[in-house]
């Protein structure tokens, strides 16, 4: 990589850093973003190595190439029981940015991705249904941007194959019973009016 020879194994150059060098070699791209998801789910035994990586951009003696930045993401503990709370030493090595769901921003992405029009028109009317997480005595009830996107994909596929899109299907992706029921009713009306006006 970069004119130098390295052996890549779990005991030498990190697979993560090796992947960056491979991208550079394969594409000629010399700068970019190295994205690490679920950073706060790293096991306690890997925490020291992760701290070193975040602060110095190195694993052992191998450094992330110049021109590459590290971006990480993690979910809050209320969304994932595997999360380990960062201590002050960890927080001191990162720039924290809390991201909140915003339908108007997501809608631009969703439109570009070809999101099912029933979902977009429904959420235009019911913005509160876009993102919701509730803990009740009956368990967790939630709906997320990922759930809507996954639902859109299965709806498009189901319609193409003439398979039913019903409450049973919708509830697998929209895991809030009230919102799932409301959307199922809306979808039935959406289909009816779509058929009437074609």
Model segments located where?
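Short, Lys/Arg-enriched charge-dense amphipathic segments
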Residues: 60-61, 80-92, 139-164, 188-192
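Conserved AAA+ ATPase small/helical "lid" subdomain
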Residues: 107-174
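Non-catalytic, well-ordered alpha-helical scaffold segments
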Residues: 48, 145-149, 177, 181
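Non-catalytic, alpha-helical, charged scaffold/linker segments
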Residues: 166, 170-192
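Short, functionally important secondary-structure microenvironments
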Residues: 195
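AAA+ P-loop NTPase catalytic core and its hallmark functional loops
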Residues: 1-128
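Generic hydrophobic, helix-prone segments enriched in Leu/Val/Ile
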Residues: 16-20, 158, 183, 187
